[in-house]
């Protein structure tokens, strides 16, 4: 059992499942900061993100750069709500390295939302124009084809959010 009281909150869900909304709610807790992948990617690579390959490359660069800092923040006792999609086994393995490296607790918030609901939210989000990225339904389908829900074998502390 860890003596570190910090918690790393992770979010898993398809595009427009409500991850960022949940992240904002979780981020209101005392001694908690939010780290948003979309903000970092849009700031660091604004002209480079046009495909899944571009996203994977840029996200991997960001993860390599930011991991040591996140571990130190967690070791310092601050909780982090990580607004990076925990949507593949490999990504969740990277996230496991963060909380294990920091010796802190974790929660994997899994948002189980149908494709139809996500696409309706996506259309609304795109129309609102307030999100860092506009995602087409075709892009949604491509990203969703790589989505892998968390499994018991991964041994995460999963909190299920059904919508």
PLM regions and their residue ranges:
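Glycine-rich, phosphate-binding/catalytic loops in enzymes
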Residues: 28, 97-100, 127
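Amphipathic alpha-helical transducer elements in NTP-driven molecular machines
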Residues: 59-63, 67, 112, 137-144
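Anionic group-transfer/hydrolysis microenvironments
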Residues: 38-40, 85, 114
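Glycine-rich phosphate-binding loop used to anchor ATP phosphates in small-molecule kinases
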Residues: 57-106
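Conserved phosphate-donor/acceptor-positioning beta-strand/loop module used by diverse small-molecule
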Residues: 102-122
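Conserved substrate/cofactor phosphate-moiety recognition/catalytic segment
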Residues: 17-78, 124
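Conserved beta-strand segments of the P-loop GTPase G domain that flank and frequently precede/overlap
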Residues: 82-83, 109-112, 160
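Conserved GTP-binding G-domain of TRAFAC-class P-loop NTPases and closely related GTPase folds
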Residues: 2-8, 12, 17, 25, ...
């Amino acid at each position: 059992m860890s003596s570190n009281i910090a918690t790393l909150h992770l979010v898993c869900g398809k595009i427009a499942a409500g991850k960022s909304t949940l992240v904002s709610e979780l981020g209101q807790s005392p001694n908690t900061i939010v780290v948003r992948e979309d903000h970092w990617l849009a700031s660091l690579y604004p002209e480079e993100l046009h495909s899944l390959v571009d996203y994977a490359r840029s996200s991997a660069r960001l993860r390599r750069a930011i991991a040591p800092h996140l571990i130190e923040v967690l070791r310092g006792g601050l909780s982090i709500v990580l607004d990076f999609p925990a949507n593949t086994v490999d990504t969740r393995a990277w996230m496991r390295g963060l909380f294990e490296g920091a010796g802190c607790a974790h929660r994997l918030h899994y948002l189980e939302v149908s494709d139809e609901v996500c696409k309706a939210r996506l259309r609304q989000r795109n129309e609102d124009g307030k999100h860092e990225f506009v995602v087409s339904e075709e892009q949604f389908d491509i990203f969703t084809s790589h989505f892998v829900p968390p499994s018991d074998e991964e041994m995460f502390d999963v909190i299920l959010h059904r919508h």
